[in-house]
Amino acid sequence: MFSKIKGTYDLMSDKMVCWQKVENHIRTLFAKYHLQEIRTPIIEYRGVFDRAAQHSEMVSKETYTFADKKERFITLRPEGTAGVIRSYVENKLDKTSQLHKFFYYGPCFRYERPQKGRYRQFHQVGVEILGQSNPFLDVEVIALAYETIKSLGICDITVKINSLGCKTTYNNYLQVFKNYLQAHYQQLCPLCQERFEKNILRIWDCKNCNNEPFLKQAPRIFDHLVEDAKVRFLQVLEGLKQMNVNFELCHDLVRGLDYYTHSVFEIVYNNEQGHQAVLGGGGCYDNLVTLFGGNPSPGIGFALGMERLMSILATHSFCNKNILPSLDAFILVSVPQFFYQGLALATTLRHQGFSADLNYQFLSFSKSLKQALKQQPLYLLILGPKEFDNNQITIKNTDTQQQTTILQKDVVSYFQNNKELN
């Protein structure tokens, strides 16, 4: 017997229905923001992710990469942005003056230690808006990420936000930060000593070093923003206030990928025990398109982790109300000889927009009835010898227990005129 791979899981029954409900809710919300869905391959050449985050630990340590039969290195996507940017450039959208607003949804893969809310195959839903850069767009995108989560009934959330400034700010600060940490190099943990050489800002993320006094006293990037970048960031903060977004300025927030500029943010959930869980995050990336060989084209985006969202929603009313999709009609066929007449009825109802099912085994009436009612149909349609001989069907309301017998040709009009089904 085979078992599922560590860090993966199966979705079925109630959980699957809840996932679909959340997915459909998010798609409907994104459509209201005039976002267009984009679907990129699950597999890309390794260089796509190397280009997007060459110093990231995600690329160096966590990706599933393999050589194909022609010795080309292929990577299962660990995140959604890089594939969208590759597609944007490959399809020459960077050469248009149009603002492109995308959303994506699908599985991603990272080889990391499985834990609660974190898997080796996981799902991201994300937004990427390409072609413009200004504080107003930052505000709407951050507010959208915030609204997406709140609209699911998860209200105790906070946006943590920082600015990495423009390229000039970023490069200047890297040198200031490095010079400061040089004197504390021996106090860094082994991982942060490695980060010191390759991706120094990730030291801010370290759980071991983050509480050390020397890091708490380190220079803050906010204090080194050039004037234009500071004005822009203050406009973003003011905009978030006007949009009633609950946010917190977080000077040590840098995000895990090294292509970000200007506004970066994470959305955290504050549970009843006082613990926080990161549900998603994102930021601006003014220079990412040029790294892929495209024309300068700034962008901003975010991604939310579906598994984290679903683990919280499991205890919320969003997934507990009407969790199972309703079945309008179950046609109970008493004997095999009547099956195709029952199937024809089910097909007719389906063509008219009603959900219908029927039995494929023919047990005693009491056993068949018991199995039919387990499907929780709104109406039970009984096709027995009497009904068959007279081209009739007996319809029973499973809630009120009232029943009536009508001609089979009138079934559709009966359902169309029934308020419970419309």
Swiss-Prot record:
Assembly behavior: Homodimer.
Family stated for the protein in its record: Belongs to the class-II aminoacyl-tRNA synthetase family.
Assigned EC number: 6.1.1.21
PANTHER family referenced in this protein's UniProt entry, alphabetically: HISTIDINE--TRNA LIGASE, MITOCHONDRIAL-RELATED (PTHR43707:SF1), HISTIDYL-TRNA SYNTHETASE (PTHR43707)
GO CC field: cytoplasm
Localization per Swiss-Prot or TrEMBL: Cytoplasm
Protein name, per record: Histidine--tRNA ligase
Catalyzed reactions: tRNA(His) + L-histidine + ATP = L-histidyl-tRNA(His) + AMP + diphosphate + H(+)
Keywords, alphabetical: Aminoacyl-tRNA synthetase, ATP-binding, Cytoplasm, Ligase, Nucleotide-binding, Protein biosynthesis
Natural source organism: Onion yellows phytoplasma (strain OY-M)
Molecular-function annotations in GO: ATP binding; histidine-tRNA ligase activity
Entry-linked InterPro entries: aa-tRNA-synth_II, aa-tRNA-synth_II/BPL/LPL, Anticodon-bd, Anticodon-bd_dom_sf, His-tRNA-ligase, HisRS-like_core, HisRS/HisZ
GO BP, sorted A to Z: histidyl-tRNA aminoacylation
Transmembrane segments: none
